[in-house]
From Swiss-Prot:
<feature type="binding site">
    <location>
        <position position="227"/>
    </location>
    <ligand>
        <name>Zn(2+) 3</name>
    </ligand>
</feature>
<dbReference type="Pfam" id="PF00856">
    <property type="entry name" value="SET"/>
</dbReference>
<dbReference type="GO" id="GO:0140948">
    <property type="term" value="F:histone H3K9 monomethyltransferase activity"/>
</dbReference>
<feature type="binding site">
    <location>
        <position position="225"/>
    </location>
    <ligand>
        <name>Zn(2+) 2</name>
    </ligand>
</feature>
<keyword id="KW-0479">Metal-binding</keyword>
<dbReference type="InterPro" id="IPR001214">
    <property type="entry name" value="SET_dom"/>
</dbReference>
<dbReference type="InterPro" id="IPR046341">
    <property type="entry name" value="SET_dom_sf"/>
</dbReference>
<feature type="binding site">
    <location>
        <position position="194"/>
    </location>
    <ligand>
        <name>Zn(2+) 1</name>
    </ligand>
</feature>
<dbReference type="InterPro" id="IPR016197">
    <property type="entry name" value="Chromo-like_dom_sf"/>
</dbReference>
<dbReference type="InterPro" id="IPR050973">
    <property type="entry name" value="H3K9_Histone-Lys_N-MTase"/>
</dbReference>
<feature type="binding site">
    <location>
        <position position="185"/>
    </location>
    <ligand>
        <name>Zn(2+) 1</name>
    </ligand>
</feature>
<feature type="binding site">
    <location>
        <position position="194"/>
    </location>
    <ligand>
        <name>Zn(2+) 2</name>
    </ligand>
</feature>
<dbReference type="GO" id="GO:0031017">
    <property type="term" value="P:exocrine pancreas development"/>
</dbReference>
<feature type="binding site">
    <location>
        <position position="185"/>
    </location>
    <ligand>
        <name>Zn(2+) 3</name>
    </ligand>
</feature>
<feature type="binding site">
    <location>
        <begin position="253"/>
        <end position="255"/>
    </location>
    <ligand>
        <name>S-adenosyl-L-methionine</name>
    </ligand>
</feature>
<dbReference type="InterPro" id="IPR011381">
    <property type="entry name" value="H3-K9_MeTrfase_SUV39H1/2-like"/>
</dbReference>
<dbReference type="GO" id="GO:0046974">
    <property type="term" value="F:histone H3K9 methyltransferase activity"/>
</dbReference>
């Protein structure tokens, strides 16, 4: 039994830095955490929560990591070796003083200002822990950052970050049983590679950018293929390649997502992930979501309207991407390790070049040219595929995208 358990791993309930603080507080030596008798008294600033000036000297009330607030201490500026926390505290303090119309050179802070600074500091800690958790959970290269400079909202409740779709009750997915025999799917494709076997042409160029029209299905190489993981026909399965930031919008659209790196036109950005459920189940959930004024239901009606992706409680960063009537992302149906046309994977590609710092959006009510749809054996219902695409939506939702050609309503 001991031999079988030797290489087992279990999730840790605390972050390593929290465990380090706990060991120091309890005076426990732990070599694995680099806690020794020599650094028992190394204290780490968790956040700054008050400020005062006395005889020209600045003092900050410090909340120490791993210690209760009752053990907070006032420290002179020279004792603090946390420039990032100091910069953020001064920025928050200035904003709060301006908002309250109080002097910026105040020698002490009023109760409401102190309360705001404490709330803001603890909010940032919660958001940072959520950010760390998502980055520990995700499999992809691109990092996730979180920012909220608008209000006091913390991480969303009842949301679990996932790396692949979660199958709901009554949903079965059959694994692919055949793959291509190509050694080089670009220069020496055998029988047209995976797309050719299904009478389609390859969707990507040598730079892994999509080259087919929206509405044309994408068939990537799969786990049964002879080619390796660096094959140019493996794109969506490689996951997010760009650093992205979940941020709070300042115009009532809730959370949004912006890119921190430039994204070239036709590049893969992210996959829309969630819980795959039956249309009947989606109908029931849709009634509840309508009452809440939210929508995370994405119909998979490439050929038949049988299944829906619900990203309300399980999803990835796409959960936070907002709608726009003039979006910079385009939806494509992708097939990899499952070829059931009722269960495509939903991939979002850049419609144009996207600058660093720009918000990412897609059209919840996207359309496909009927000519293109017909030419690719696609059911014309795909013109309604997406978050809008079924009778689940029973109420009008106001659009707040703000673009010139805004349709005023999402649905």
């Amino acid at each position: 039994m001991a031999r079988d358990l030797k290489d087992c791993r279990v999730p840790c309930k605390l972050l390593l830095e929290d465990l380090q603080a706990l060991c120091r507080r309890k005076k426990l030596v732990c070599k694995q955490l680099s806690v020794t008798k020599n650094n028992f008294n190394d204290y780490e600033v968790e956040y700054l929560c008050n400020y005062k000036k006395h005889k020209g000297r600045e003092f900050f009330l410090v909340k120490w990591k791993g210690y209760e607030e009752s053990e907070n201490t006032w420290e002179p500026l020279k004792n603090l070796k946390c420039p990032i926390l100091l910069h953020q505290f001064r920025k928050d303090m200035k904003a709060a003083l301006l908002q309250a119309n109080e002097p910026l050179d105040s020698a002490s802070l009023s109760g409401p200002i102190i309360s705001f600074l404490r709330q803001k500091a603890t909010q940032r800690i919660r958001l940072k822990k959520w950010e760390d958790l998502m980055n520990q959970t995700c499999w992809h290269k691109g990092r996730i950052f979180v920012s909220n400079e608008v209000d006091m909202d913390g991480p969303p409740k009842n949301f679990t970050y996932i790396n692949e779709n979660k199958l709901g009750k009554g949903v079965d997915m059959n694994a692919v049983i055949v793959g291509c025999e190509c050694e080089d799917c670009v220069s020496q494709p055998v029988d047209g590679c995976c797309p050719g076997l299904l009478k389609f042409r390859r969707a990507y160029n040598e730079s892994r950018r999509v080259k087919v029209m929206p509405g044309v299905p994408i068939y990537e190489c799969n786990s049964k293929c002879r080619c390796g993981p660096d094959c140019a026909n493996r794109v969506v399965q490689r996951g997010i390649q760009y650093d992205l930031c979940i941020f709070k919008t300042d115009n009532g659209r809730g959370w949004g997502v912006r890119t921190l790196q430039r994204i070239n036109k036709n590049s893969f950005v992210m996959e829309y992930l969630g819980e795959i459920i039956t249309t009947d189940e989606a109908e029931q959930r849709g009634v509840l979501y309508d009452k809440q004024g939210v929508t995370y239901l994405f119909d998979l009606d490439y050929v038949d309207d049988v299944y829906t992706i619900d990203a309300a409680h399980y999803g990835n960063i796409s959960h936070f991407v907002n709608h726009s009537c003039d979006p910079n992302l385009q939806v494509y149906n992708v097939f990899i390790d499952n070829l059931d046309e009722r269960l495509p994977r939903i991939a979002l590609f850049a419609k144009r070049g996207i600058k660093a710092g720009e918000e990412l959006t897609f059209d919840y009510k996207m359309t496909v040219d009927p000519v293109d749809a017909e030419s690719t054996k696609m059911d014309l219902d795909f013109s309604r595929a997406g978050i809008e695409g079924s009778p689940i939506k029973r109420v009008h939702m106001e659009c707040k995208c703000g673009v010139r050609n805004c349709r005023k309503y999402l649905f």
